[in-house]
Amino acid sequence: MRGKMTYKILKNSTLLFLFTILISNTIKADEAIETNNQSSLNNSFSIEEIIVTAEKRSESLQDVSKSVTALSSDELETKNIIDFVGLSAITPGLTVAKNEGYKTVISIRGVGDETNQNAIAAPSVALHMDGIFVASKFSLRTDFIDIERVEVLRGPQGTLFGQNSTGGTINVISKLPSSDGFEGKADLTVGNYGLVKSRGSFNFPISDNVSTRNSFVITERDGFSDNVINGQDLDDASHISLRSDWLIETGDSSSLRLFFQYFDADNNGAAMKGLDDKTPNPRKLAQDSASDYKLSSEIFGAIFEVDLGAANLKILASTQEDDIYVVRDNDRHNFGDVHASGPLEGLPYIAAEFRPETSIVETKTFEINIVSNEPLFGSIDWIVGALYFDHEIENHIYEVKDVNNVKLIDLMDGQFTPYVHAPICATNPFEGIC
């Protein structure tokens, strides 16, 4: 095979050589015309320069030595990328996936979360919003809103971006308010499964020095799956995203930016089918417990920038809070289902239910960066910075298990008031009132 392939290459090369000799005079005659045409083509064709902040300074992507993927808002729009999970399809080396129905795993080049972790475990891929470190991994479940671009940096980034960036960093850059004039757009999407999605973004110049940009995304969609026991619609979507961004020009070379972003999800939850579920349809399952999923995520940020001449001073501060509430069938089966294989073959599944699991994640950050505008001694770019970080996680799991397998179905129907239980529930959680 190798000899045959080599023969073909040599044969084609010979023909090309002969062809070049035969038409060489013609090429010389047309050389001037071709040169002029090529010059015109070069003038009319140019590659758009992409500006990124991968090294905490604005510079052309072609000048950055790091491995960076920069995705513009137009590219995200064209490819229908609406959240972090969608980035996996178009970003080399990046994996973002939903896990266990309400959590997210993320890795870059295999470094990060490959399996689900507990509520306080942090991935090895850092998330930033307009340069502000976002600590809660529940923020990966939010929808994109009014994005300018997304930068994905592959490889260790701890020197510039700090903790949790061994695998890399994702930086989401939002569109800035502008004082150039009023600008707005809105659209409505309607699809199958009852999908109704509305979006809008509006820029308002308040004065010569103050402008604001406000955006919203509202999504409603029926579920893709059904629980045949209680008729619950699963894998549905009921999301709302809001963002308000304000830019104040405090001087000729300084500015203050204030923004607030809010995301809320109130869904029935994800379809997590058990291994021995008897329903043949992959989009149907049989579970005796109802499920519920609620997530609220909010961030208030402030960014102050001033040009000092030789360097640029940037101060970033934020307060963040993520609240999550989950109810689910933790055994993934209907009461009475048995193990079909393995060491427990023939034995029934132990009924279990989260009633509920809750997490409250509160974060405060304060960061100062001084970034050189001109190289030191003509060849050294430098950055000096400091970061204050306060991160608190409060996680509660109330799990009910029928260890004796004597449960009646109506005792674990998911109808209960969270945190309000009779005293008997402490010793007998399967009492009907628990």
Regions found by a protein language model. Name each.
Residues P343-P348, I409-C434:
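Flexible glycine-rich, low-complexity coil/linker segments exposed to the extracellular/periplasmic environment
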Residues G101, I106, D143, G181, ...:
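Mobile, glycine-rich extracellular loop/lid and propeptide segments
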Residues A122-S124, S136, I145-E148, R154, ...:
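Outer-membrane beta-barrel translocator/receptor signature
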Residues M1-N12, F17-K79, V85-I90, N203, ...:
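N-terminal Sec signal peptide and the immediately downstream disordered periplasmic leader
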Residues E55, I173, D187-Y193, V217-T219, ...:
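Outer-membrane beta-barrel pore domains and translocons
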